[in-house]
Amino acid sequence: MTKTRKTHPLXKIINHSFIDLPAPSNISAWWNFGSLLGLCLAIQILTGLFLAMHYTSDTMTAFSSVTHICRDVNYGWLIRYMHANGASMFFICLFLHVGRGLYYGSYTYFETWNIGVILLFAVMATAFMGYVLPWGQMSFWGATVITNLLSAIPYIGTTLVEWIWGGFSVDKATLTRFFAFHFVLPFIIAALVMVHLLFLHETGSNNPSGLISDSDKIPFHPYYTIKDILGVLLLISALMTLVLFSPDLLGDPDNYTPANPLSTPPHIKPEWYFLFAYAILRSIPNKLGGVLALVFSILILMLFPLLHLSKQRSMMFRPLSQCMFWILVADLFTLTWIGGQPVEYPFVIIGQLASILYFTIILLILPTVSLIENKLLKW
């Protein structure tokens, strides 16, 4: 008798995606982050839903409503800090997931990769709008500074900014629409995730060697379900340690001061996961140039399939490319550090050099090194 999971229309989809899915036998722990991102998204949607039940998106009451959630709502403090730090865990998993894709050449699956980049943009937009909602000082000024960047667009810039603000400054209209978008975007992200998986399952997973693994596949369940559960336990342990021991470790103290349009904080900076892009933005003295560099710093990921000149897919057997990859990672850490520093010597020059290095490695050095490796192997 055929099993229900193989015949029932709904159970069949789940079966083909998570149970009888043929998976390469050699995928390492770096392949755990996809499922962890799914878990992060689920945590964020659930905690966010409960926060939305008590939050009010009005400039007069937003800050107080967040305080009320933390003080008066049953386990409100836990929900709020799980949501705030859940975003950090989300981005850690995202960066590692993208890094894995770059290292092992997963970007050669064009559709999966490009939808992944769109997902990255969507998650960044959602996180930015979520940061505005508590209506603290850094929320307000972060929103003002980042939305104001659009005014650099020639001709329509100013009109566009005022249209997004819903007035002549960040105010009630801005907060209300940011809340609306922040609420709806995660569901759009969930839909995009399904498309991401749809395209991935058309080709099957990549593996560390970068070789075709059709001759050596194993069922996803139980092998990778149990492996994913280990990742889930580690992620939840890390998240709960952060939430219960130092929930404000990654936040900004300025956000405990209610938003005041008349007083600018000495150092306006976004959350840690945007600092690398913020450093690239600040390293260019021209406003439009900075905005273009900021957008291109993420959009450049879409160029990776075109810049792949190696005859091998993965970096597993390419020591020179590996070396450049880890220099790129170190450069991103440097940019993250610089993004959190004030705009003064020597941080400005370090930021500019790190920004130049970031684009040079991706656009010039990695492709060149790939060609050198091809030559060394007489390919």
UniProtKB/Swiss-Prot annotation:
Transmembrane stretches, start-end: 33-53, 77-98, 113-133, 178-198, 226-246, 288-308, 320-340, 347-367
List of residues binding heme b b566: 97, 196
Compartments (UniProt record): Mitochondrion inner membrane
Residues annotated as binding a ubiquinone: 201
A Gene Ontology biological process term: mitochondrial electron transport, ubiquinol to cytochrome c
Assigned keywords, A-Z: Electron transport, Heme, Iron, Membrane, Metal-binding, Mitochondrion, Mitochondrion inner membrane, Respiratory chain, Transmembrane, Transmembrane helix, Transport, Ubiquinone
Cofactor, how bound (note): Binds 2 heme b groups non-covalently.
Cofactor(s) in the UniProt record: heme b
Alphabetical list of CDD domains matching this protein: cytochrome_b_C, Cytochrome_b_N
GO cellular component: a single term: mitochondrial inner membrane
Protein's membrane topology: Multi-pass membrane protein
Molecular function as annotated in GO: metal ion binding; ubiquinol-cytochrome-c reductase activity
InterPro entries with a match to the protein in the record: Cyt_b/b6_C, Cyt_b/b6_C_sf, Cyt_b/b6_N, Cytb/b6-like_sf, Cytochrome_b, Cytochrome_b_C_euk/bac, Cytochrome_b_N_euk/bac, Di-haem_cyt_TM
Binding site for heme b b562: 83, 182
Remaining remarks: Heme 1 (or BL or b562) is low-potential and absorbs at about 562 nm, and heme 2 (or BH or b566) is high-potential and absorbs at about 566 nm.
Membership in a protein family: Belongs to the cytochrome b family.
Described function: Component of the ubiquinol-cytochrome c reductase complex (complex III or cytochrome b-c1 complex) that is part of the mitochondrial respiratory chain. The b-c1 complex mediates electron transfer from ubiquinol to cytochrome c. Contributes to the generation of a proton gradient across the mitochondrial membrane that is then used for ATP synthesis.
Assembly information from the UniProt record: The cytochrome bc1 complex contains 11 subunits: 3 respiratory subunits (MT-CYB, CYC1 and UQCRFS1), 2 core proteins (UQCRC1 and UQCRC2) and 6 low-molecular weight proteins (UQCRH/QCR6, UQCRB/QCR7, UQCRQ/QCR8, UQCR10/QCR9, UQCR11/QCR10 and a cleavage product of UQCRFS1). This cytochrome bc1 complex then forms a dimer.
Entry protein name: Cytochrome b
Organism annotation: Urocitellus washingtoni
